[in-house]
């Protein structure tokens, strides 16, 4: 009788442990940027990486203040976050990661990824960068430690080499000659931005009167 009870108890333990043993890790992409404002090239890049690599999601991660940017020259994080939320609303595979806006201060990728990995130990992160940024990786803050926290994904760019001493997954994404600078200039001059960014983001910019001041257009 005692042996049967022990057998049942052992089976119960196995049943409880089974889900943990067979858990699959989440595969998540991160696309960082100022998103001032977010535009279709950002969204196409995030969507293509998610689809081509089969990631669970790609999070657009707005910076509060990049290490190389003057705090006075960027639009408020409240507006940038609101536009991002509008931009990804119709795509369940895209989302927002606001960790750097919450933390505030200068944003070093290593610090951000360390915090994310500690908060989400079951997640593998894929950090998306443009091919033009790969050559600057040696200058990134604590790059050797960062390599233990993320897998870099490089977006191929014309006239930029794909050779690197760092492990990078390369992805082809349609090239779109759209930039936040271009959009801000068009808004400032009263030109149409249709087909450059989502319609709901265009409406938000108009409703809030964004990018009309010279200060708003410096980044």
UniProtKB/Swiss-Prot annotation:
Superkingdom of this protein's organism: Bacteria
Protein role: Catalyzes the reversible adenylation of nicotinate mononucleotide (NaMN) to nicotinic acid adenine dinucleotide (NaAD).
Enzyme class: transferase
EC number: 2.7.7.18
A Pfam family: CTP_transf_like
Name of protein: Probable nicotinate-nucleotide adenylyltransferase
Catalytic activity: nicotinate beta-D-ribonucleotide + ATP + H(+) = deamido-NAD(+) + diphosphate
Keyword NAD among record annotations: yes
NCBIfam families: nicotinate (nicotinamide) nucleotide adenylyltransferase, PRK00071.1-3, PRK00071.1-4
InterPro entries the record matches: Cyt_trans-like, NadD/NMNAT, Rossmann-like_a/b/a_fold
Family of the protein in this entry: Belongs to the NadD family.
Gene3D superfamilies (alphabetical): HUPs
GO molecular function terms listed in the Swiss-Prot or TrEMBL record: ATP binding; nicotinate-nucleotide adenylyltransferase activity
BP GO terms, sorted: NAD biosynthetic process
Pathway field: Cofactor biosynthesis; NAD(+) biosynthesis; deamido-NAD(+) from nicotinate D-ribonucleotide: step 1/1
SUPFAM superfamilies: Nucleotidylyl transferase
Native source species: Enterococcus faecalis (strain ATCC 700802 / V583)
Keywords: ATP-binding, NAD, Nucleotide-binding, Nucleotidyltransferase, Pyridine nucleotide biosynthesis, Transferase
